[in-house]
């Protein structure tokens, strides 16, 4: 952001994933924060909370149960063969992408993986087994984050969904500006991601 490259934290998930016994929580909204904070009181061991710096809107179904280590379905469409997986403050982009795809007649599941470690492999297995297309979106380095967790799992499975990651490139940012300005500089916007997804789906323009 405006504070410059020294204040960018886009490698933290990768670093924390590598630490034994570390629990890693990357919430998408205040509801997830509230519920996991309550649960963390009785948790044994360290927890790394990856929080955004400003008030994100509540997008979770507040009647749904939020648990540490369990994914949170934000949008669920039984007839869709496409899943968008995201974590943390990429929530706005994930929902904008879903909305833009709907305008093209493409419906998706949108799932918040708020706990990166321990990861919800049970839900991921169901997604990988049932969806033809899987996309991950995260405001983190392309290396070591949510996309890496998912790609590692797919690589070791016998399943073969079409999979693509959307994240920040493996380079330091020399830009100074707002979060949205830097997202645009790195082509990490909903419009560009939507177009890339449509191309992957073979959408005819």
Predicted region positions:
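Thiamine diphosphate
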Residues: 50-205
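Conserved thiamine diphosphate
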Residues: 1-83, 92, 201
């Amino acid at each position: 952001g405006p504070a410059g490259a020294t204040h960018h934290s886009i490698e933290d998930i990768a670093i924390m994933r590598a630490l034994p016994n570390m629990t890693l929580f990357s919430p998408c909204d205040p509801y997830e924060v509230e519920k996991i904070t309550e649960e963390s009181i009785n948790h044994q061991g360290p927890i790394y909370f990856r929080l955004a710096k400003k008030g994100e809107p509540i997008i979770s179904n507040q009647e749904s149960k939020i648990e540490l280590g369990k994914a949170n379905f934000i949008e669920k469409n039984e007839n869709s063969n496409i899943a968008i997986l995201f974590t943390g403050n990429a929530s706005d982009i994930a929902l904008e992408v879903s909305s833009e795809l709907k305008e093209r007649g493409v419906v998706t599941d949108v799932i918040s993986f708020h706990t990166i470690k321990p990861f919800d492999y049970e839900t991921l297995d169901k997604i990988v087994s049932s969806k033809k297309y899987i996309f991950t979106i995260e405001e983190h380095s392309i290396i070591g984050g949510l996309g890496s967790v998912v790609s590692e799992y797919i690589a070791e499975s016998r399943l073969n969904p079409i999979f693509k990651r959307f994240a920040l490139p493996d380079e330091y940012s020399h830009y100074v500006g707002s979060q949205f300005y830097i997202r645009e500089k790195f082509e990490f916007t909903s419009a560009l991601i939507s177009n890339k997804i449509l191309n992957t789906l073979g959408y005819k323009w």
